Amino acid sequence: MYGAVSNNEAVNNAGAINRAIDDCASKGGGRVVVPQGEYSTGSVYLKSGVTLYLEPGAVLKGVHDIGAYAPLQTTLDLSRYESGQGTVNYNSATDAQWSKAMIFAVGISNAGIEGKGCIDGADVRNPLGEEHMRGPHTLLVAGCKGMKFEGFSVKRSANYAFLAYQIEKSKFTDLSIQGGWDGIHIRGAKQVEIAHCEMHTGDDAIAGGYWERMSIHHNKLNSSCNGIRMIMPSERLDITDNEIYGPGTFEHITSHRTRSEAAINLEPGGWGKAPGRMDRIRILRNRVRSVLTPLSVTLSDDNTMGSLLIEDLEARDITRMALSVKSWGRAQTDRVVMRRCNMEFQGIDDPSLPGWFDNRPTSEWPVFPVWGMYFRNVKEVDAKDVKLSVKGKDYRKPWMVDNVEKHNLHLL
C-alpha cells in the first residue's frame, strides 16, 4: 500500500515508511506494522500517537549513503548538554554531522517502537562525523513525553543506539543492544525508566546526565568502557538490581580495547562543564564482576553532592581500582552511607607501591594508595557490614579517608 520493498538494499524505504506513519497519525494514531523482511532505510520520523511495531523477523536496516540521513531539526535550546568542546569528541545537537540519525522522535508524545524485530544501524561511517568516522545515531529522541521503546533489538549502531534530549515520563524496557558505541545515552530526563534490557556495547552502556527521578533497574550491562556513566549531575537517581560485568563482548571501536572500566561512573563535568548538585543517589542490590572499579564518584569544582546510599553491592574480580567517592578540588559530598557490601579486589603484588605515593600529587596517581575504598572531601562516611577482600598480595591499606569530617567504618 505504501510501496515499501523488502530484501533489496538498493531501495531506500524511508519515503514509504514515513508515508505510513504520517497516514496513521492523520487518522488519530495507532500502530504501523513492519512485517517480516529486511527494509533498508534512511531517516524515519515518528509521530505523536503512533507506535512503530516490528514483527518477529522484521529488520529496519540503515542504508550506506550518509546523505540519506538528516540532522536533528528542533527549536529546543539544547546548548547546556554540549560536551567535549575543543576535542574530536565534541557533541552538539546543532552539529549537522553529530545529530544525524536513522530514526527521529522530535517534539512528540505517546509514541514509540515495540515488537520483537530488529533495527540494524549497519555501522555506517561518516568521515565528517565524531572522531572522523562515527555515523548516524540509530534513534534520536528530543523534547518528547510518554515515549515507549520495548522488546526489539538494536545492532551495529554507527554511533549511539539511542540518543535522547529532554525527555519525560518515558520507558526503555526489554531491549537488546549489541555493538556500536553508547547504548542508551540521555541528556536531560524526568521520570525515565531503563529496565530489563541487555546491552553489549563498545562504549558506555548507559550514559548522559541531568537526570531527575531516573530509574535504572534489572539490566544486564556489558561494556568495553563503563556500564553506567553519568557526565552531568542528577537527582533522585536509582540504580538497582543490575548485573554489570566485563570484559566487553564488543571492542571499543575507537581504542580497540575490551577491558571494562567502571561498573558505575558518576563524574559530572567529566566531558566539559556541567554545573549543579547531585543528591539522593541510591545504588542498591547490584552485582558487579571483572571491571576496573565497582563505583567511581568524582565531583568537579562546580558540583556538590548531598546523599549517596550504597546497599547490598556484590563485586568480584575488581581488576585495579578501589571504590571511590571524591573530588580533587573543593567540591564536597555531604553523606555516604554503605550497608551490606561485599567486594573482592585483585591485589597488586608490589611491596614498593605504598611508599611510591609519598609526596606525589594526586594528578600522578595511577591507582589509589589503598586497594578497597577511598573517600575524599566528604563530610560523613557511615559504612556498616562491609566486607573487603583481596585476591593475591597487596601491601597497601584496605581503605582511606582524606578530608572527611566524620567517619564510622564497620568492616567485616
Please provide the spans of the model-predicted regions.
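Extracellular/periplasmic carbohydrate-active domains that bind, remodel
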Residues: 1-412
